[in-house]
């Protein structure tokens, strides 16, 4: 990581400067959205990245924080994994990282990205215990120059572990998007994630069913590879919203490898589904808070 060190004055802080910085920064984030899943392999990060890009495509200012310390891939999926991360030094001695941005050649409002994937070599594991992971996440929240955002998207690792607790205890989430697939084993773990967010009193909790179906490229028929309707039934059972289905898209792998969100391939079924998802989310948050979600 390359460091540049202009000195910036900061106001007096309390007994826990990092916690205070988080609280000050949070005031500039209109909506804080968690994206999580009960288990791995459901395409959670794909949903987080494409929701981010869809919101930016709609003209919103969006930041995405990759809270998966041990398996970060958001930066690669957004094509900024090779970007250098710079930092500014403040007069109290702490540094704040400057998040790389991407606008995909003007196709979207610039997206701010921060991930451990930009700070460690691709093949180097992060072998940290819980306390170090907790500190790292707090630093990604409080020691990054996020600035004013319409949406802060936080991509969590699979499961219901320390990372989620750390964020929920540090900032007030406005919504949690739980990603699942139609498979029964995924739905079982999804229910746990939904109930965790409800217990944490997150104001809005919703389910998204990813890899919901495939449109055959030859005949155009819909194929339910992993079953049908499981995500919607789970949402009904748990009493939360169902935001929609994201189809399997053959272009998604190519797009991900290139560091381009599939939502920018406008004519694909997945792109259309992600835009609908983003619009539904904005409308729901507008309904809850009584405004359009945009500064």
UniProtKB/Swiss-Prot annotation:
Task: Report the Pfam families cross-referenced here.
Answer: ParA (PF10609)
InterPro entries under this entry?
Mrp-like_CS, Mrp/NBP35_ATP-bd, NUBPL-like, P-loop_NTPase, YlxH/NBP35
Which of this chain's residues are annotated to bind ATP? 38-45
Coiled-coil intervals, chain numbering: none
Question: What highest taxon heads this organism's lineage?
Answer: Archaea
Sorted alphabetically, the keyword list is:
ATP-binding, Hydrolase, Iron, Iron-sulfur, Metal-binding, Nucleotide-binding
- Gene Ontology biological process terms in this record: iron-sulfur cluster assembly
Q: Please give one Gene Ontology molecular function term for this protein.
A: 4 iron, 4 sulfur cluster binding
Q: What does this protein do?
A: Binds and transfers iron-sulfur (Fe-S) clusters to target apoproteins. Can hydrolyze ATP.
Q: How does it assemble?
A: Homodimer.
Q: Which family does it belong to?
A: Belongs to the Mrp/NBP35 ATP-binding proteins family.
Q: What is this protein called?
A: Iron-sulfur cluster carrier protein
**Organism of derivation:** Pyrococcus horikoshii (strain ATCC 700860 / DSM 12428 / JCM 9974 / NBRC 100139 / OT-3)
Q: What is the lineage of its organism?
A: Archaea, Methanobacteriati, Methanobacteriota, Thermococci, Thermococcales
